[in-house]
Amino acid sequence: MGGGMKAALVRYLPLVLLALAWEVGARTGLVSTLALPPLSTVAAAWIELLKDGELITNGAASLWRAGAGLFLSIVIGAALGIVMAWWRPVNVLLSPLVEMFYPMPKSALIPVTALWLGFGDASKILLIFLGCMLPVTLGAFNGARSSEQALVWSARSMGANRLRMLWDVVVPSALPELLNGIRTALALSFILLVSSELIAAREGLGYLIGFLGASGTYDAMFAVVLTVALLGFVADRIYLVLMQRMLRWQA
């Protein structure tokens, strides 16, 4: 068995043990099946939801909202963070707002976005955009501020204008911190997505979790919860691979 296979087995062994404990605990009565249905029952419910198209339809709605909000937060947040780091007047103007809103629970904005834009996609996209923009902005800001002054002075001595220095020196220097901020935003997008859909939505995975829970179909509810967890995990793994390649390319 190769070293990579062994490392994967060791890494995911806790998940396998957790799944076994879940199944055995529910089957033997150690845990109430109302509180925690057997994992095999949850898997069967997941297959039924997939056959019925519920997972596909609601999953597509959720992924569209999360993707659109995250994309906007990356584009605007990255630009805003770099501009704040590069132009002091902009930093002085916007830093108090960033510092005030960053620690605020972003789920508190759910009623506000629903009031402004209703229960459709727009309110969810706005919520995810607002919530995810701040970690991206701070990542870009911290990365741009850490630019080596020697490189900046070198570019300036070679006649590079301010915009050229920004693009050739500051943006590449900001990339590692920016990518870390985007990873934080990626995780946050799933949290905000499900939270908003639980409260103010007519479709989506969060809505489906709430609907199934209210109807007492707990095996299907857990199936959707695990689906969200799996989507978040896969998205993070894919992003890590892309992030490593980008940093390797930069080096």
Task: Pin down the residues of each PLM region.
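Cytoplasmic-entry segments and transmembrane alpha-helices of multi-pass inner-membrane transporters
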Residues: 4, 75, 79-114, 138-142, ...
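Loop-to-helix entry region at the N-terminal start of transmembrane alpha-helices
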Residues: 57-65, 115-136, 174, 179, ...
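Glycine-rich helix-loop "coupling/hinge" segments at transmembrane-helix boundaries
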Residues: 114-116, 144, 191-228, 247-251
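Transmembrane alpha-helices
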Residues: 126, 130, 162-196, 222, ...
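Short cytoplasmic-facing helical segments at TM-TM junctions of multi-pass membrane proteins
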Residues: 139, 143-184, 205, 209
